Amino acid sequence: MMNVATIGSGVIVDRMIEAMRLDGRYNLYCVYSRTQERAKEFADKHGIQKYYTDMEEMLNDENVDIVYVASPNSLHYKQSKMALEHKKYVINEKPFTPTLKECNELFEIAKKNGVYIFEAITNVHLPNYQIIKENLSNCGDIKMVQCNFSQYSSKYQRYKDHIQTNAFDPNFNGVALMDINVYNLHFVTGLFGKPKDVHYFKNVGYNGIDTSGIIIMEYPDFIATCTGAKDCSSP
């Protein structure tokens, strides 16, 4: 059984802890949060005995095998890099990193230190997705692929009231492309590979972030569109 350290205290971490316990192969060893009050509160909530407020101290704990990174998007690269450099396995929440350069660097660091890093993306691992993949050749001549993941954010009203939250903060990469449309991108590229060209058309909020947008992906014989929104919902 491998010992897991979690970084972050949002709802997604609650769900990951629940999933790991259901799986039975992981021991929830410790949690990390920036403040002692929040770290203790989150640890107590999940019955985890150990908590840290110092990242370096946590990573120096020899009992930690895996680090699950679920902090704001802009921190994924830095925190994953620190964990890999301490020879910890890493499960990094989506979006993996803001840039391809950072992504490739993390893979190189993992390889150098003899550990692995994974992106915690879910949809491409679901049984129904595998069925689609296995039966794609039976679908005939594909000309259009349409994906839509639009979910009105519970924090959008606060954003409209000019109350800043991480979910809509450009400093934390709180944008629709990375938060929502990333699922559509995985869905399409997992089935069809890299497109020959990509265009992104977005609705931009008052602070410069995209609150929704449409990606058009051009393949040799068809077009795929990916719609992702945090400012409205789809059926």
Regions found by a protein language model. Name each.
Residues T6, M16, H46-I109:
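Beta-loop-alpha module in the N-terminal Rossmann-like domain of NAD(P)-dependent dehydrogenases
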Residues L185-P235:
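Contiguous beta-strand/loop segments that form the cofactor/metal-binding neighborhood of enzyme cores
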Residues M1-H46:
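N-terminal Rossmann-like dinucleotide-binding module
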Residues E105-T122, D141-M144:
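Rossmann-fold dehydrogenase core element
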Residues T35, V124-H125, N148-S154, K202-Y206, ...:
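Glycine-rich beta-alpha junction loops
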